[in-house]
């Protein structure tokens, strides 16, 4: 993404990578739940999908968002907040597992969570792409006037 000089285009490319990550994680989990995908490959694809979501989001997304809209801000702060939300989710799952007597199969819990979060993630990412494209077009019109 360093090769893309236009910050808005780079922001959209980051969205595409995030979208692909959600799709890979969700589709591979669906195939696993239908017993069409071996558990080993399911873990590989879910890991790849989550990696494709996490890396652009935490290393490129905020930096290019700030640059694309000429905002004053610090990408490090946004990355810290996003990581904190992720850690809260991880800790919540661990506390629920250890603190409550939940009778749950963790493979089922994980696969359902991946399916739900992938589905939600695709729609949120598509909406974000729409929103930022609309905002970018409005800022171009405002600067042209």
Q: How should each PLM-predicted stretch be described?
A:
Residues 1-6, 130:
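Structural signal for the C-terminal ends of transmembrane alpha-helices
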Residues 6-55:
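C-terminal transmembrane helical hairpin of 12-TM major facilitator-type secondary transporters
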Residues 52-70:
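Intracellular juxtamembrane helix-capping segments at the cytosolic ends
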Residues 31-40, 95-112:
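Extracellular/periplasmic helix-loop-helix junctions in multi-pass membrane proteins
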Residues 102, 115-145:
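Multi-pass alpha-helical transporter architecture, strongest
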Residues 44-50, 107-122:
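Alpha-helical transmembrane segments of polytopic membrane proteins
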Residues 68-101:
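A late C-terminal transmembrane helix in Major Facilitator Superfamily
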